Amino acid sequence: MGKHIQYQGGNFKNTAPTKYQPTDLKVEEVLINIGPQHPATHGILRLEVILDGEIVVDVVPHLGYLHRCFEKHAATLPYNQTIPFVDRLDYLAAMNSEHAFAMGVEHMLGLTGKLPRRVEYIRVLMAELNRLASHFMAIGTYGIDLGAFTSFLWLMRDREYILRLFEWASGARMLYNYIWIGGLYYDLPVGFEERCLEFITYLKPKLEEINQLLIDNTLFIKRTANVGVLPLATAINHGVSGPILRASGLRLDLRRIDGYSIYPELSFDIPIGEGLMGHVGDCWDRTWVKFQECKESIKITEQCLVRLTSDLKRTADFNPQKMVPKKVRTKAQDCYIRAENPRGELGFFFRASDNGDKPIRCKARSSSFSNLSVISSIAKGQVLADLIAIIGSIDIVLGEIDR
């Protein structure tokens, strides 16, 4: 009747003679494509993955599916008309991107340090609220990647409060055009500070619930601890920044190092990876650092609200557009400005012409682009299922990568 398989003590024994011995079997590597339309890639990203069985041999990211010519737009439009395009870089942190771009142009105009204090505090308040919303999206979708759906729903519920505050202040939920060169589109609506403080008070215990539900969850720890370890030297060599770099053990935060805007006046800590559940720089550390940064953003937000409701409270004669130039005209110069976005260093290099209303060249330095570049280094030797965990922990936005 041909070959039979007999079960003997846990081993299957082939009673018929075999033509090939196990040592003669050939193993071939398999190439698969993940994306560009795949929820686990967090955007329009294609990963060319070479596998030996289920072990990742190499990963090659392919970009360009979301390229929208930002730098060409920036070189052909007046400075103030470029801000709506800046919103579309990291569309999950548009306030932070606007802040960085506005600071760059203000530096060229000689306005650094001359803006009204209320304007500066409102800018930082909005930037930190947007950092919270961005980290909520990052941690929530990461939970989905690993099979934890409830945490995503809870974080999206809390993120919705922030989007409603932004909509109240700017009229938009995601792409704001609120931070203008030299000022703001509009002062905060009456009652905004009080409602924002109510939200922060509500949020504190909710974060502890997320910590118990996801961050300290045994299954989550098993899926992320000791997975995708990013050594500090590798992170520095690839230009990694933000929470991904800090998770590898380097306490580097541009808000503290550069001290831009009013951050030197604020008190906050800079969490770094400590390897509490595994190895420093693993997937769990990257998620834990982002979670701790949410707590620090709450501290900064509270300090801003205290100032905005006391010595910097609204007055009838306050005009947030007082320093906004009607037409931006710069001197011939080169300028590079950077800011600490939720995903790391966002920088803008300007080459300006004399008395020009637009730059000769505007180069955007994307944090997500540099952070994604380490995927090949840290994914090799991991199983395919862990590759998904690694991508989610890096937290990329393709709008910022492709530009």
Swiss-Prot record:
InterPro entries: NADH_Q_OxRdtase_suD, NDH1_su_D/H, NiFe-Hase_large
GO terms for MF: NAD binding; NADH:ubiquinone reductase (non-electrogenic) activity; quinone binding
Entry coiled-coil feature ranges: none
Pfam family, one: Complex1_49kDa
Compartments reported by the entry: Cell membrane
Enzyme class, first EC level, given as a word: translocase
Keyword Ribonucleoprotein: no
Record membrane topology: Peripheral membrane protein
Catalytic activity, EC: 7.1.1.-
HAMAP family: NDH1_NuoD
Family in the record: Belongs to the complex I 49 kDa subunit family.
Function: NDH-1 shuttles electrons from NADH, via FMN and iron-sulfur (Fe-S) centers, to quinones in the respiratory chain. The immediate electron acceptor for the enzyme in this species is believed to be a menaquinone. Couples the redox reaction to proton translocation (for every two electrons transferred, four hydrogen ions are translocated across the cytoplasmic membrane), and thus conserves the redox energy in a proton gradient.
Protein name: NADH-quinone oxidoreductase subunit D
Gene expressing this chain: nuoD
